[in-house]
Amino acid sequence: MKTQLGCSNGPALRILLVQAENLRWRQARSYPYCLNFAFEDGLRANGIECLMVTTPWISRIRDICGEKQFDQVWINDLSHFCDFNISLEEIIDLAPIRVGFVTESVDYYQDEYEAFPWLRERRARIDKQFKYVTHIAAVDEQDVLNLKQRFDKPTMWLPCSMPEGYIYEQVSTPAKKMALFSGSVYGKRVNWLKEPKLKTMLAYQKSPNSRLVDATLFNLLPGHRFGRWMNNRLFPAHHIYPVYLDWLRQLRRKAHTLWLQGMQAGAAVVNLPHLVKGYSSRVIEGLASGRPVISWEIPDRPKNTALFEDGHEILLYSTPEQLATQIERVLSDPDFGERIAQNARNKVRRFHTTEKRVQQIVHWVGATDEAQDYRY
């Protein structure tokens, strides 16, 4: 249902969404839809005038925007913007309010910095981006406190969400009587997948959204790997860019649908330990796909843990033994797994759709420092 946000008697709110996008499908396919293009869906569903500009085209942002005026700029996201050689200085005078999203943790533990030295470098690059924004929305609840203190800017917590249209109503019987993990295999995940206790009940599933045709089309898009020459000032951006964006949307939506359908192949979706200290996109994707989700319980993040009730809407674990027990519960009692999955879908539909999250961001920006409650 479409709602109208903005002035009650005035025009709709106008937001420029600056979206991080990679040039190659090999890297770009790992960008979760629910953390990128979904925000465009959520803005439009709320009656907000939205123009999205992706990073391959940010050098032409003035040509693309033309004479348009904006109330806000949303930068999605600073975690990935720091991977590109791009300055956000261009966006400072595009709108008085500039909201920077952070979809990865900014701060990490000492042992994580030692295992992944690039995290320190990324933090330094992210820190440089904060001077260009007026508001910060972070996925890690501890970062919310730290960033607000360090940069003295309004900061809100931003848990993952899912566009309502991608929440499945009917789900078929799983093809495999196993729990599945889909995603990057790094760090401790390698050992988890080799655990003897888990070998017969947990399988790794390769991403289903890596088809050669889609990868080739993505890489050939204007401004991308093989189409960079079309992002040239000799070509009129206001003609080329809308066509580019339409093709990109189609590829992103198709890949997202294939990803969700792939999650339905197993009896449960497993979220293995990860670096970000908030539920990864895999959790909300698994819940939306209609399968019970068994997730690593993130230490020292009570708000995150409270998003979904353990044993009723999600199943949590901290050790390989606990993970094996939770998987066995689902495999031995399919009705129990279906109840967990249905309860979770109900929760997502009521409180964690992207449409709802967009409303929360807009209202928070309008009433800075107003706390958001996601625990219902």
Please provide the spans of the model-predicted regions.
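Short acidic/histidine-rich motifs immediately flanking catalytic phosphotransfer sites
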Residues: 66-74, 267
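Active-site proximal beta-strand in glycosyltransferases
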Residues: 91-109
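Nucleotide-sugar donor-binding catalytic core of glycosyltransferases
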Residues: 2-62, 77-87, 105, 111-284, ...
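Glycine-centered loop/turn motifs
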Residues: 310-311
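Conserved acidic donor-binding segment of nucleotide-sugar-dependent glycosyltransferases
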Residues: 314-320, 329-334
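A charged, aromatic-enriched C-terminal amphipathic alpha-helix characteristic of glycosyltransferases
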Residues: 332-365
